[in-house]
Amino acid sequence: MVKITKEAALLYHSQGKPGKIEVVPTKPYSTQTDLSLAYSPGVAEPCLEIEKDPQTAYDYTAKGNLVAVISNGTAVLGLGDIGALSGKPVMEGKGLLFKIYAGIDVFDIEVNEKDPEKFIQAVKAIAPTFGGINLEDIKAPECFEIENRLKEELDIPVMHDDQHGTAIISSAGLLNALEVAGKKIENVRIVVNGAGASATSCTKLYVALGARKENILMLDSKGVITSDRPNLTESKKFFATDRRDVHTLEEAIKGADVFLGLSKGNVLTQDMDRSMADHPIVFALANPTPEISYEDAMASRPDVLMSTGRSDYPNQINNVIGFPYIFRGALDTQAKAINEEMKLAAVHAIADLAKQPVPDVVNEAYHVNNFTFGPDYFIPKPVDPRLITEVSMAVAKAAMESGVARKNITNWEAYKTRLRELMGQESKLTRQLYETARRAPQRVVFAEGIHPTMLKAAVEAKAEGICHPILLGNDERIEKLAKELDLSLEGIEIINLRHDREAERRERYARILSEKRARQGANLQESNDKMFERNYFGMMMVETGEADAFITGLYTKYSNTIKVAKEVIGIQPEYKHFGTMHILNSKKGTYFVADTLINRHPDTDTLIDIAKLSKKTVEFFNHTPTMAMLSYSNFGSDTEGSPAKVHDAVDYMQKEYPELAIDGEMQVNFALNTKLRDEKYPFTRLKGKEVNTLVFPNLSSANATYQLIQSMSETEVIGPIQMGLNKPIHFTDCEASVRDIVNITAVAVIDAIVDKKKKEK
């Protein structure tokens, strides 16, 4: 676990704008008309509509996406009763988590009131503002009364996350750990060390999942809770045992299958761990020091299935994989409550997710080759991008089925897409690419079949239904790797290009290539040798029509790939040059950037080809190009060197394509600021238009720009997309992720579809 110093923590919270959250306007406000609509007099209209029908508050205000994180500061993290104001940094932090994981807006509310009745009345009074209420850091037993009363008396979702968040995540972990251990929940003996809000809520949920009360022993600071003990709270009474033969943790733990600790550090010894049943499940959730350390538990017995609350060990029980998505599903159905059915739906969704193949982005975040379901991975990781869809959708369905939803979701695919877009996992353009590719999947050759990233991408592309993958590489190595990564190769062709069984194909390809390039110095023997190289072989598959598209680049430099592509595929006859483009999907919109990889120092003719290809490519993606050709000068302010080349290219393009919105040369700030450009240069062909296509003067500026934007923002980048080759040959780079390659595969498939349609005409 990363060591955090006091100085670093205080600096983090104080630097820049103090705190961690802010309110951001969601409507325009730059003109007087905007302000008149936002406030007086325009604001009166939605007020009157809400007066007539309070339900319309979900249509005209932020209520439907707004949660209150409310606390009185009586049980703050590991700090105890530090007061409402002192707990504000924690509540702001909770708001931050809601926003970054589920796109939910939060007001943190610190109520300086310990009396439960007065606290309840305060919360009820402000409840109309919110779509849901997350109670936080309120001590037991008051928290039980507060939550129960608010759930009864309000018509919006209310959840005390300290109780139910831990319960939901640990329940999902318990179901999966039991599956790994080969045990059934109704048969296991469970020992719970701790009797606070979290412990009792966890144990109640275990019972709801099938655990038997008579198989559960709960302990508090005095030992095993027995039914003959006087003055028990209602929650302790519920789990009090009639047994009189056990009093201590050491006695209770003998032969137990499950240990749940929500107490204090270092209370479970190695001897106690060893006294448990075979394949024991140990959830040591005290923070920051667990009841038994991960190292001690594993050293005491190798068959233990272990979870802690810490991120530096496997199977972390972390509430963040629950509460954002539970509220997301509740808000999206305008639910009146978060009920048991919704909580159980979340449990099963989280548990099921851990059994699915893990996205590459998760593996990369934890620097592992591949997480697979088992002793070291039975709870999903907080960074898993599927949580927003799987858990939110399960909760929303449960809300509808249990009758607490006021709004029904009818199109679940559309809802899933909206959730992905909400978190920036999917843009409209990406979705269109996939949908188009699915209509006519093509045969796509993946050059580096033995590379884990390429293999995962091919499998994912197949699962998405966008292509029929063909992997190049040693079939035995690929099959072994697929087994290690727990990937199915069903429906995926593997070609071992260097095997004797491919000799005839290599010879045929060599003859075709040597004949094609006979006047460029090629001979049959050299061509034969080249067919043992994956790029030559794969591109020849496309050239001969035995495949439709080709993806390469994880093992090969661009310069080498470009050389082979020119040799085998060639440039389209209407151009003398080819280039590449990257697409940037930002919050401001979609931008097309060229040339990002090929032409180092383009002259005027090369820039003209890049501009032509960019126009064609942007139109290929169903956008209308509005193109700025960039330089460090503006419209002839410098008449030498690079600006002059760009200037001449613009002149040519404007004459040849009078309908095209293109101008330059110009600096990038004028290209992207329409108001500034129109004020200073009102004569341009771009007047009043938002630029979406940027042609850079050289490779250095284009390449640096797209990588800078990719590194410093949340912009989705698709590319490189080749422009100008005769066939669909596309490149990746050595740092490409699985998602990058799948995106390029979708582009390659559409490229192949368009190519075939042209030839049919």
Regions found by a protein language model. Give the residues of each.
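NAD(P)-binding Rossmann-fold cofactor-contacting core
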Residues: 193, 209-236
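N-terminal ligand-binding/catalytic initiation module
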Residues: 1-158, 353, 397-398, 431-455, ...
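Adenosine-phosphate binding glycine-rich loop
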Residues: 2, 161-162, 181-183, 284-392, ...
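Helix-enriched interaction subdomains in cytosolic or periplasmic regions
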Residues: 12-45, 390-423, 559-562, 593-596
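Glycine-rich adenosine-cofactor-binding loop
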Residues: 66-78, 83, 167-170, 181-207
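Rossmann-like adenosine-cofactor binding region
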Residues: 237-304, 310-312
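Anion-binding alpha/beta catalytic cores of soluble intermediary-metabolism enzymes, centered on
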Residues: 85, 137-184, 406-409, 415-761
